[in-house]
């Protein structure tokens, strides 16, 4: 039987942790996943490595407020600000999902100073996949 490996301990108080290095990526891709409950904005380099991300919940919204266009706007602004620290200037946008924050997130990426190139909808379309949820009775 091999010897048990010890788990890496958390850094001690006062000990410096390794700082994330700043990448210099002028062109990237913004992936916006907008569901009925949340909006997640991820900005990657051309190879798909994540540079910055933000979501409606991460920005500070809880519950049904996460699904609002305003929450998506703040999430996109937050992700754009983080990405600009890494030198991102231009992004191609890939939108996925049926949520209400799709267009708002794209507009706020532009307003935050990122130049938006191509916009593509990559929402997966089922070829008659699983049965949809039953109709709501309110």
Swiss-Prot record:
Residues 1-27 are annotated as: Disordered. This is Small ribosomal subunit protein uS11. PANTHER family: 40S RIBOSOMAL PROTEIN S14/30S RIBOSOMAL PROTEIN S11. One of its GO terms (cellular component) is ribonucleoprotein complex. Belongs to the universal ribosomal protein uS11 family. Part of the 30S ribosomal subunit. Interacts with proteins S7 and S18. Binds to IF-3. Residues 1-12 have a biased composition (Low complexity). PROSITE patterns: RIBOSOMAL_S11. It comes from the Bacteria. InterPro entries: Ribosomal_uS11, Ribosomal_uS11_bac-type, Ribosomal_uS11_CS, Ribosomal_uS11_sf. It holds the Pfam family Ribosomal_S11. Located on the platform of the 30S subunit, it bridges several disparate RNA helices of the 16S rRNA. Forms part of the Shine-Dalgarno cleft in the 70S ribosome. NCBIfam families: PRK05309.1, uS11_bact. The keyword Ribonucleoprotein applies. It comes from Mycolicibacterium paratuberculosis (strain ATCC BAA-968 / K-10).
């Amino acid at each position: 039987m091999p010897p048990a490996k010890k788990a890496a301990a958390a850094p001690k108080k006062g000990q410096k942790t390794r700082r994330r290095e700043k990448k210099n990526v002028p062109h990237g891709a913004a992936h916006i996943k907008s569901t009925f409950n949340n909006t997640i904005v991820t900005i990657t380099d051309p190879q798909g490595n994540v540079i910055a991300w933000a979501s409606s919940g991460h920005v500070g919204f809880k519950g049904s407020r996460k699904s609002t266009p305003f929450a998506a706007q703040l999430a996109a602004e937050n992700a754009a600000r983080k990405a600009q620290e890494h030198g991102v200037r231009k992004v191609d946008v890939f939108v996925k999902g049926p949520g209400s924050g799709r267009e708002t997130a794209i507009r706020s990426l532009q307003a935050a100073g990122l130049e938006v190139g191509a916009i593509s909808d990559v929402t997966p379309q089922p070829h008659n996949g699983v049965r949809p949820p039953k109709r709501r009775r309110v």
